[in-house]
Amino acid sequence: MLRSLFGRNRKRKGVGATGPAQDDSIRSVKVGDVLSIQGLALEYDDRYFYVEKIHRYANEADTWYELTCVDGDTHIWIDWTDGYDLLVTATDDPDPVGLGSIGLTEEQLIDLDEENSIDNFIAVDGERYDYRNSSEVAFYQDNRGEGQGLYLWDFLREDGERLLSISKWEGRPFEATFSEVIAPDSIKLYKGERTHPGSRRPK
């Protein structure tokens, strides 16, 4: 899960006074589109993924989206936020791990949340992950409905190339997931049908 990793509570950029321009970036993605992705560690450069689902997350400061993308039996999950900068992460691992697997405890997470300091960090498998944010979040499945609450902690690996997100849903154990930070221009979007006039699928 993804928010303002490189700064806390930064405001979203406004739309320019001249009106929105044609946007072929991930910002304009919709269910039914197709995308390709380059630069992911597991090398899917020659694969084309169908965007099957789009979920939305939001807290007081930011909104971000999670795409479920499929190509045959292969799934990838792409998160993106457009707060201060367009920031994108991706993973092909659907299975979270528990806190014990990464050497953390609930008490440590509570302390990190209360201290709320980006000077804090944790070590996972000998690698440093810097604390970036923690907050209560609303999850909107398929970008609809009233939303379901959860709590999230985000940590960014020291080199800025990997994100660790830890979530806590009511009635469920803590879940930790890893994803890879990728350049926004490494994703090429092939738009499907649009309901508004003048929209065409890029060649």
Regions found by a protein language model. Name each.
Residues 1-203:
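Mixed-charge, low-complexity intrinsically disordered regions
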